[in-house]
């Protein structure tokens, strides 16, 4: 049987929940959904996200340090309002979340490493899906992730080749960026351009 929001919140770490609610209230952010915390496993049914234009978030019930960090990450999207490239949006939200974890004594090495991986993967996606040239990425952000331009190039090339070979649809992320619907052949052509750029 599906749990109610009240039942989910009863399982929260009450100290963490108070901190999260204080941040939400201070920044006038409304919770669209309190979602179950899925223990860092990805799930199509549980998606934590921020709706910047509406000042709303869907966040996990904070039960441990990691779920607290996820809450702060989504709050960070609203507070900072970064709308630039995906990797920059995530970097700014991660910096906000890490700062709050440090302030409240919840930062762990695992959280920090997870944040760096997450931002790097968005750099890879921006490189492939948005066809951003590698030298256009922030050097400071790349350095913070602990990766190099060469690592970014190799990872992006690997992803582009997989997508080029296996794709049978245009990603939603790319469709939402274009004024008109992008055909699959146009998407494949974009991937081909990306592969050529990355193999120069």
Question: Which residue ranges define each predicted feature?
Answer:
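A metal-dependent hydrolase signature that marks the N-terminal structural subdomain at the beginning
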Residues: 1-37, 196
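Active-site scaffold of zinc-dependent metalloenzymes
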Residues: 26-65, 78-81
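Charged, often glycine-rich, active-site loop that binds/positions anionic groups
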Residues: 45-47, 94, 127
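Catalytic Zn2+-binding segment of zinc metalloproteases
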Residues: 60, 75-92
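Long, well-structured alpha-helical subdomains associated
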Residues: 62-63, 103-200
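Short alpha-helical catalytic segment bearing the HExxH-like zincin motif
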Residues: 66-74
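Active-site catalytic microenvironments for nucleophilic, acid-base chemistry
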Residues: 78, 82, 99-104, 197
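An active-site-proximal "capping" alpha-helix that borders the catalytic cofactor pocket
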Residues: 88-103
């Amino acid at each position: 049987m599906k749990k109610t929001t009240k039942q989910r919140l009863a399982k929260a770490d009450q100290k963490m929940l108070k901190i999260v609610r204080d941040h939400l209230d201070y920044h006038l952010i409304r919770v669209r959904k309190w979602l179950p915390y899925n223990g860092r496993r990805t799930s199509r049914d549980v998606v934590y996200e921020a709706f910047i234009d509406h000042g709303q978030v869907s966040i996990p019930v904070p039960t441990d340090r990691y779920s607290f960090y996820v809450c702060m990450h989504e709050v960070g999207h609203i507070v900072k309002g970064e709308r630039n490239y995906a990797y920059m949006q995530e970097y700014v939200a991660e910096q906000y979340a890490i700062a709050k974890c440090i302030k409240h004594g919840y930062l762990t090495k695992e959280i920090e490493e997870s944040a760096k991986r997450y931002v790097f993967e968005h750099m890879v996606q921006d490189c492939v899906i948005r066809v951003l040239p590698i030298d256009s990425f922030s050097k400071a952000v790349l350095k913070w992730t602990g990766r190099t331009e060469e690592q970014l190039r190799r990872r992006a090339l690997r992803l582009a080749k997989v997508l080029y070979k296996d794709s049978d649809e245009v990603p939603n992320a790319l469709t939402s960026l274009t004024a008109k619907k992008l055909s699959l052949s146009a998407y494949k052509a974009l991937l081909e351009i990306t592969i050529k750029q990355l193999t120069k």
